[in-house]
Design a protein with these regions (language model features):
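Extended N-terminal export/anchoring regions of large proteins
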Residues: 1-237
Length: 237
């Protein structure tokens, strides 16, 4: 009697696997925020209830799912610094991640974003662009031995917090072609709705905060803005 060296079932080749890819196309996929433990991941609005949370950080570009003003942070809302910190809003720019353009396909190429005016949408030709050196909001700037001044904060910025709790505003300044750093010296409110009131300039921030090469960081921020700013962009990219 001859016995097989392997079970008969192992000789049967299964059919190729069927893989179904489902892409969420709900309205919330246009959101620019994703905050844990809040309604639909919106960012809490201190002037409203949970249903009125912010959906968008940047100004209305005309192609968002929601157009009512209450969904947009505006200059006052952008003083809620945690909305522009990847630690609290996981969609926002993270300086430790390299943001690449979308993969090209067919005749469609996705090039590095413009460092001054990155497009609002990866492939919609009439979607417009954002001036990264435009004003996002303004805040009081403390000056040593001088009266306080007003600091216009540019769109190309983000916040980071050190282990000892110091909050830093990092501005990738395209007009000066360098990175500027500011320590937050005064806030109001608490929790997710903590709002910055005053900052002071810092020349030597801690190593975790310091940007090694301005040009690369500016390009990385521009790429994030065009290709990774929204929930849908992350899913498609």
């Amino acid at each position: 009697m001859d016995l097989a060296d392997q079970p008969m079932m192992t000789a049967i080749k299964p059919a190729p696997a069927n893989i179904m890819i489902l892409l969420d196309d709900s309205d919330s996929m246009t959101f620019e925020v994703l905050a844990a433990d809040y309604n639909e991941g919106r960012f809490p609005n201190p002037a409203g209830d949970e249903q009125d949370g912010y959906s968008y950080i940047f100004e209305n570009a005309g192609d968002n799912a929601f157009l009512d003003d209450i969904r947009y942070m505006g200059q006052a809302g952008r003083k809620l610094w945690k909305s522009q910190s990847h630690t609290h809003n996981v969609l926002y720019y993270n300086p430790e991640i390299a943001y690449d353009p979308w993969p090209s396909y067919g005749n469609q190429d996705f090039l590095p974003a413009d460092r001054k005016f990155p497009k609002l949408h990866p492939f919609k030709k009439n979607a417009g662009a954002m001036d990264l050196d435009g004003e996002s909001f303004s805040v009081t700037l403390e000056l040593e031995a001088l009266p306080d001044a007003v600091l216009p904060v540019k769109n190309a910025h983000y916040f980071q917090q050190t282990e000892n709790g110091v909050i830093y505003l990092v501005v990738l300044d395209g007009d000066e072609n360098k990175t500027n750093y500011f320590a937050i010296t005064e806030v109001e409110g608490s929790g997710m709705t903590e709002k910055i009131r005053k900052v002071r300039s810092v020349t030597t921030p801690p190593g975790k905060i310091r940007v090694e090469e301005y040009g690369q960081a500016r390009q990385n921020f521009a790429n994030w803005f065009t290709y990774h700013r929204r929930r849908e962009y992350v899913a498609k990219g």
